């Protein structure tokens, strides 16, 4: 057994790119018209599997295929390890039988959503996986079913999201990562991920247009179909899945210039409720842009309720966090 240090980049995990790094070359994928089982590492037939697969091999050899096949579904046998993280009470690595439902993982194993908040979505498969909505929480988890709903098994990542999560922001976050990790070899992946991130940024900052949704879908399909490796082939998943299941959230950002989850800072408006304001001045003290005016109430003088100048406000949220009387509202 020999252990080699990989290239480090996300794309270097792709099979042919991984072999290239072992050979000492740049970790770029190559065309698959010749499969690695025919010509792989140093142009020799090569069988590449991940660590989890190799860990199962000794048990299958010792106990037989029938023993291993007792667990799982028709098309996905055995168990799967997931990294369960996000808005869930119990986080960590969990090993579950194939075919278990998302509900069982999130609620029975994960302990549900903290603070009594509502489950919104779960993203599976790593950075290029798709987001699965609450309406599909009883979906059995296996390779085929995850692919059918626009996600994938991938590296076994599972990020739970609650009602405070903005799906446009989620798509933008993952596209930012994927555009940086693209090796740039194929135009579709290099330019497609970059352009999708640019459009998502425009939408989240209030410059979105109705036609942007269809443009994102078109870019996503072209990027997936024309890319050389699985990174480009799956990179649009965060965008396409969030549009598929949360289109209304995109429309709210574009048409009403509003972020329902109150995450996209450029679309937020902070307002002091004068009837609730205690005129303590806490909000004005922490405002970095001096956008809040008013007069502090003292024993000798009457105060003036504070107000926020929208032109000066940088939407940092400091006023909202500092107010103990819930006199600052976010719209």
Give the positions of each predicted feature.
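Hydrophobic alpha-helical positions that pack around
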Residues: 1-98, 110
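Ferredoxin-type iron-sulfur electron-transfer modules in oxidoreductases and energy-metabolism complexes
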Residues: 140-269, 274, 293-305
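Short amphipathic, charge-patterned alpha-helical segments
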Residues: 99-115
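Active-site loop ensemble at the mouth of alpha/beta enzyme cores that anchors a bound cofactor
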Residues: 18-33, 135-152
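Terminal amphipathic helices with adjacent charged low-complexity linkers/tails
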Residues: 1, 114-148, 244
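C-terminal accessory/binding modules appended to enzymatic or scaffolding proteins
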Residues: 78-90, 96, 102, 262-314, ...
